[in-house]
Amino acid sequence: MPAPTQLFFPLVRNCELSRIYGTACYCHHKHLCCSPPYIPQNRLRYTPHPAYATFCRPRENWWQYTQGRRYASTPQKFYLTPPQVNSILKANEYSFKVPEFDGKNVSSILGFDSNQLPANAPIEDRRSAATCLQTRGMLLGVFDGHAGCACSQAVSERLFYYIAVSLLPHETLLEIENAVESGRALLPILQWHKHPNDYFSKEASKLYFNSLRTYWQELIDLNTGESADIDVKEALINAFKRLDNDISLEAQVGDPNSFLNYLVLRVAFSGATACVAHVDGVDLHVANTGDSRAMLGVQEEDGSWSAVTLSNDHNAQNERELERLKLEHPKNEAKSVVKQDRLLGLLMPFRAFGDVKFKWSIDLQKRVIESGPDQLNDNEYTKFIPPNYHTPPYLTAEPEVTYHRLRPQDKFLVLATDGLWETMHRQDVVRIVGEYLTGMHHQQPIAVGGYKVTLGQMHGLLTERRAKMSSVFEDQNAATHLIRHAVGNNEFGAVDHERLSKMLSLPEELARMYRDDITIIVVQFNSHVVGAYQNQEQ
């Protein structure tokens, strides 16, 4: 759980960094800060408003300034040993294998690997995985927080329950409600698959349960009791939208408990994107809000790997998103609703949970802030109204849902936050995972592209290949192996231990200038079961 200053006072920390290093920091709190000149602006979630220019103003001679000073926190010739590197990379890895019955796995999923590599302190990414116990299928998701980790934490805990409830038939919802009324034990809805370090908020569990119960009560009232097939796409959309609505409502109503009152406000004023997969037999649905991605790994007949994108980024690079925003607001806002590729010139993702500063009316924002705790009322960011803020809401948590029917050649699915996709091309991601899972990486010829390679350099590449092969065997987790490549790859696509060591040795105030938090889930499909489904249909 982050300290209050980590959510509501990011500018203070950023300004200190800018004074120390002579330039504005590259802060993946993704808040009102700007980047050093050498970092692309399109990698920031937030850009500065002129009112904050004095907080984040880079020096004109920033590079000479940094070269003229040395700090103890800057690594010079210190390198982590391979065991130390492995210890860092494997600290958050988790693997789950679907259990067999009578010696057989009847699920379309063999299992999954997940891992996280933080750059923020604390990490703002979250991950979740659970088996639906009252319906069929498994849920897996990654959540990328900004302006702190409060919103991503809440969404990672709550969203799967909202999805599971949305998928339940009317009679099961009635059974659960009757159990609550009579004080009987509830039917378990989800079986979680979590790393021991993954956090659950015990303090907010009652608040979260009451909101969820209100949701299923409304579903009971809306349903006439007639048996009908549940539309998974509609259930996913309803769950996303309802959770975001509850996050907003809880912040508006507040709580008598001062801790919970502050918590719900932190959740609402921070934000999070989400990319969730629901796998039921050969039916794969991906619900995406924001700029995390889902990528399908397909093995072609010749053994090569192809990447099939199952999600779309909701940002300025998506023409349909730009058109949607313009249609949702008056024509006189066409030039202001998206400026410098950001929502109102500030926010990079066009869809997200929380971020009520882009959803609430100005009057509502002022009322909540004035009646809220002092930490909220005294903060400059929370009181700041985005420019050209005329017709809210400008932001939505409604997901875009993609459906794919699994085939035997569909071998795995990669869910990852943008920290991975900023460093690696989707085709490289699929190839590396595919080669890892099949053990075929060492059979491929070395590709040097257009480089002129000397005999000595070729010897170095062969040495690196041997090291790369050994890293495959030491990585028992596909997500860990992918992170190793994302952070340590050189220009030839091989893991460079020196580079990997340098990147992992960076102090936290510098790490954010070079990379984002990375969270990955690799889901491996059971080709035999998928093929059996296909044969039954034929």
Curated annotation (Swiss-Prot):
<dbReference type="InterPro" id="IPR015655">
    <property type="entry name" value="PP2C"/>
</dbReference>
<protein>
    <recommendedName>
        <fullName>[Pyruvate dehydrogenase [acetyl-transferring]]-phosphatase 1, mitochondrial</fullName>
        <ecNumber>3.1.3.43</ecNumber>
    </recommendedName>
</protein>
<dbReference type="GO" id="GO:0007165">
    <property type="term" value="P:signal transduction"/>
</dbReference>
<dbReference type="InterPro" id="IPR036457">
    <property type="entry name" value="PPM-type-like_dom_sf"/>
</dbReference>
<comment type="subunit">
    <text>Heterodimer of a catalytic (PDP1) and a regulatory (PDPR) subunit.</text>
</comment>
<feature type="domain" description="PPM-type phosphatase">
    <location>
        <begin position="109"/>
        <end position="525"/>
    </location>
</feature>
<keyword id="KW-0106">Calcium</keyword>
<keyword id="KW-0479">Metal-binding</keyword>
<dbReference type="InterPro" id="IPR001932">
    <property type="entry name" value="PPM-type_phosphatase-like_dom"/>
</dbReference>
<keyword id="KW-0496">Mitochondrion</keyword>
<keyword id="KW-0809">Transit peptide</keyword>
<dbReference type="GO" id="GO:0005739">
    <property type="term" value="C:mitochondrion"/>
</dbReference>
<dbReference type="GO" id="GO:0005509">
    <property type="term" value="F:calcium ion binding"/>
</dbReference>
<comment type="function">
    <text>Mitochondrial enzyme that catalyzes the dephosphorylation and concomitant reactivation of the alpha subunit of the E1 component of the pyruvate dehydrogenase complex (PDC), thereby stimulating the conversion of pyruvate into acetyl-CoA.</text>
</comment>
<dbReference type="GO" id="GO:0004741">
    <property type="term" value="F:[pyruvate dehydrogenase (acetyl-transferring)]-phosphatase activity"/>
</dbReference>
<feature type="binding site">
    <location>
        <position position="516"/>
    </location>
    <ligand>
        <name>Mg(2+) 2</name>
    </ligand>
</feature>
<feature type="binding site">
    <location>
        <position position="144"/>
    </location>
    <ligand>
        <name>Mg(2+) 2</name>
    </ligand>
</feature>
<dbReference type="GO" id="GO:0000287">
    <property type="term" value="F:magnesium ion binding"/>
</dbReference>
<keyword id="KW-0007">Acetylation</keyword>
<feature type="modified residue" description="N6-acetyllysine">
    <location>
        <position position="202"/>
    </location>
</feature>
<feature type="binding site">
    <location>
        <position position="145"/>
    </location>
    <ligand>
        <name>Mg(2+) 1</name>
    </ligand>
</feature>
<keyword id="KW-0904">Protein phosphatase</keyword>
<feature type="transit peptide" description="Mitochondrion">
    <location>
        <begin position="1"/>
        <end position="71"/>
    </location>
</feature>
<comment type="similarity">
    <text>Belongs to the PP2C family.</text>
</comment>
<feature type="binding site">
    <location>
        <position position="144"/>
    </location>
    <ligand>
        <name>Mg(2+) 1</name>
    </ligand>
</feature>
<dbReference type="GO" id="GO:0044877">
    <property type="term" value="F:protein-containing complex binding"/>
</dbReference>
<keyword id="KW-0460">Magnesium</keyword>
<keyword id="KW-0378">Hydrolase</keyword>
<dbReference type="InterPro" id="IPR000222">
    <property type="entry name" value="PP2C_BS"/>
</dbReference>
<feature type="binding site">
    <location>
        <position position="418"/>
    </location>
    <ligand>
        <name>Mg(2+) 2</name>
    </ligand>
</feature>
<dbReference type="Pfam" id="PF00481">
    <property type="entry name" value="PP2C"/>
</dbReference>
<dbReference type="GO" id="GO:0004722">
    <property type="term" value="F:protein serine/threonine phosphatase activity"/>
</dbReference>
